[in-house]
Amino acid sequence: MAPVVISESEEDEDRVAITRRTKRQVHFDGEGDDRVDQQQQQHSSSHRDRDKHVQRKKKKRLSNRNLQGSNGGYAWEDEIKRSWDLVKVDDEGDMASLVASIVEARKKRTAKKNITPYQRGIIRSLILTLDCSEAMLEKDLRPNRHAMIIQYAIDFVHEFFDQNPISQMGIIIMRNGLAQLVSQVSGNPQDHIDALKSIRKQEPKGNPSLQNALEMARGLLLPVPAHCTREVLIVFGSLSTTDPGDIHQTIDSLVSEKIRVKVLGLSAQVAICKELCKATNYGDESFYKILLDETHLKELFNEAVTPLPVNKINKGFTLVKMGFPTRIFEDTPTFCSCHSKLVYGGYFCPNCHSKVCSLPTVCPCCDLMLILSTHLARSYHHLMPLKTFAEVPTTEKFRSEDCFSCQSRFPILKNHKNGKLLTSSRYRCEDCKQEFCVDCDVFIHEILHNCPGCESKPVIT
């Protein structure tokens, strides 16, 4: 067999091929190492991100633990979420929580109800001032502060004119560092409700200006007669105020003109609001309140419905001339003096015989206050509040089995374990000695303001 002879040119080609394969292998190994390093870095970074996310969630849970209610949500959401958990039964099946809540609610209402007869200004002029700044976009009140306050303000207008029919109200909003008048001072509740519904669609913007709002309220209350009280109710949600000048001068002018200011705070306490309430209420700091939840906000609005007691610093007494007009019925429409519109019927002023549409109002011709006797009676109950009914003890022998007012049988709530009554469910008037159920008790004190037992007594002539 002949030997194989390899030329020099073939050897050179083999060397070049081996060198190229080696370089490609080295290059591939380098790229593989780089890819492995990149994968390891990405894997480690994802682990770090995951650990940071877990730590943030743990910190958030720890920080929100104090804000959580019994049902796992926020504390202010316990009122609505899983409300059926509030009614619980014990081992014997008694609805202990339900009875306890009724008794507790009554005790709370009785403790807060002030039955001391004070001299109060029943002819009121109130300026309702609402914060419509960016702070009202907070959602600690559902769905947010702005929507909640507008709804509660509408309810407040209804209740205010129901309990104070011969009073007047105006509405101001604070927005973009300015004060805007949305409803003139008048005694027509529908005008104020329509104005509140219109600003419900507006988005809160900017910062509030407490000084501008107080100056506008002062200007609206200047023409008010001396026999009327001058009040300003402010709903303030921000923690600061953007004022164009010295607000302390505005406070001094409010004090000199006997304008009393009450502030309902939605956030933390603000020093200038505390100073404002203290200066305008003869040193009383209790007129600045900070709400706790939605129920507390409703209670604060209800407190503002009751007229303020007249301070001893105020001078003397004022006799107010009032007119009781007669109702007229017409077959053809005639012009009224209050709106200059054609209307059927109305009321004739007994002083100048001008025609007005509705009551109560002030005659646009002679400035005489025109009211009905029922309006005066509804305002009078603030001066002489009805006494609180006393709960009948369970150990006493009951006089009757039916409520004197609604004629319904009193409920019997016993403990199945020992057979004792949990509560008598009877509340007695100290004057007429008649007994009422809890529903009639609440209705009599909050709406009727007259005891049916006392009113049904025969009049001795």
UniProtKB/Swiss-Prot annotation:
<dbReference type="InterPro" id="IPR007198">
    <property type="entry name" value="Ssl1-like"/>
</dbReference>
<comment type="similarity">
    <text>Belongs to the GTF2H2 family.</text>
</comment>
<dbReference type="Pfam" id="PF04056">
    <property type="entry name" value="Ssl1"/>
</dbReference>
<dbReference type="GO" id="GO:0006289">
    <property type="term" value="P:nucleotide-excision repair"/>
</dbReference>
<dbReference type="Pfam" id="PF07975">
    <property type="entry name" value="C1_4"/>
</dbReference>
<keyword id="KW-0862">Zinc</keyword>
<dbReference type="GO" id="GO:0005675">
    <property type="term" value="C:transcription factor TFIIH holo complex"/>
</dbReference>
<protein>
    <recommendedName>
        <fullName>General transcription and DNA repair factor IIH subunit SSL1</fullName>
    </recommendedName>
</protein>
<dbReference type="InterPro" id="IPR002035">
    <property type="entry name" value="VWF_A"/>
</dbReference>
<dbReference type="InterPro" id="IPR013083">
    <property type="entry name" value="Znf_RING/FYVE/PHD"/>
</dbReference>
<dbReference type="InterPro" id="IPR012170">
    <property type="entry name" value="TFIIH_SSL1/p44"/>
</dbReference>
<keyword id="KW-0863">Zinc-finger</keyword>
<dbReference type="InterPro" id="IPR004595">
    <property type="entry name" value="TFIIH_C1-like_dom"/>
</dbReference>
<keyword id="KW-0234">DNA repair</keyword>
<dbReference type="GO" id="GO:0000439">
    <property type="term" value="C:transcription factor TFIIH core complex"/>
</dbReference>
<dbReference type="GO" id="GO:0006357">
    <property type="term" value="P:regulation of transcription by RNA polymerase II"/>
</dbReference>
<keyword id="KW-0539">Nucleus</keyword>
<feature type="compositionally biased region" description="Basic and acidic residues">
    <location>
        <begin position="26"/>
        <end position="37"/>
    </location>
</feature>
<dbReference type="GO" id="GO:0006367">
    <property type="term" value="P:transcription initiation at RNA polymerase II promoter"/>
</dbReference>
<keyword id="KW-0804">Transcription</keyword>
<dbReference type="GO" id="GO:0008270">
    <property type="term" value="F:zinc ion binding"/>
</dbReference>
<feature type="domain" description="VWFA">
    <location>
        <begin position="125"/>
        <end position="304"/>
    </location>
</feature>
<dbReference type="GO" id="GO:0000112">
    <property type="term" value="C:nucleotide-excision repair factor 3 complex"/>
</dbReference>
<keyword id="KW-0227">DNA damage</keyword>
<feature type="compositionally biased region" description="Basic residues">
    <location>
        <begin position="53"/>
        <end position="63"/>
    </location>
</feature>
<dbReference type="GO" id="GO:0061630">
    <property type="term" value="F:ubiquitin protein ligase activity"/>
</dbReference>
<dbReference type="InterPro" id="IPR036465">
    <property type="entry name" value="vWFA_dom_sf"/>
</dbReference>
<dbReference type="InterPro" id="IPR046349">
    <property type="entry name" value="C1-like_sf"/>
</dbReference>
<feature type="region of interest" description="Disordered">
    <location>
        <begin position="1"/>
        <end position="70"/>
    </location>
</feature>
<dbReference type="GO" id="GO:0006366">
    <property type="term" value="P:transcription by RNA polymerase II"/>
</dbReference>
<keyword id="KW-0479">Metal-binding</keyword>
<keyword id="KW-0805">Transcription regulation</keyword>
<dbReference type="InterPro" id="IPR013087">
    <property type="entry name" value="Znf_C2H2_type"/>
</dbReference>
<comment type="subunit">
    <text>Component of the 7-subunit TFIIH core complex composed of XPB/SSL2, XPD/RAD3, SSL1, TFB1, TFB2, TFB4 and TFB5, which is active in NER. The core complex associates with the 3-subunit CTD-kinase module TFIIK composed of CCL1, KIN28 and TFB3 to form the 10-subunit holoenzyme (holo-TFIIH) active in transcription. An additionnal subunit, TFB6, plays a role in the dissociation of the SSL2 helicase from TFIIH after transcription initiation.</text>
</comment>
<comment type="function">
    <text>Component of the general transcription and DNA repair factor IIH (TFIIH) core complex, which is involved in general and transcription-coupled nucleotide excision repair (NER) of damaged DNA and, when complexed to TFIIK, in RNA transcription by RNA polymerase II. In NER, TFIIH acts by opening DNA around the lesion to allow the excision of the damaged oligonucleotide and its replacement by a new DNA fragment. In transcription, TFIIH has an essential role in transcription initiation.</text>
</comment>
<feature type="zinc finger region" description="C4-type">
    <location>
        <begin position="349"/>
        <end position="366"/>
    </location>
</feature>
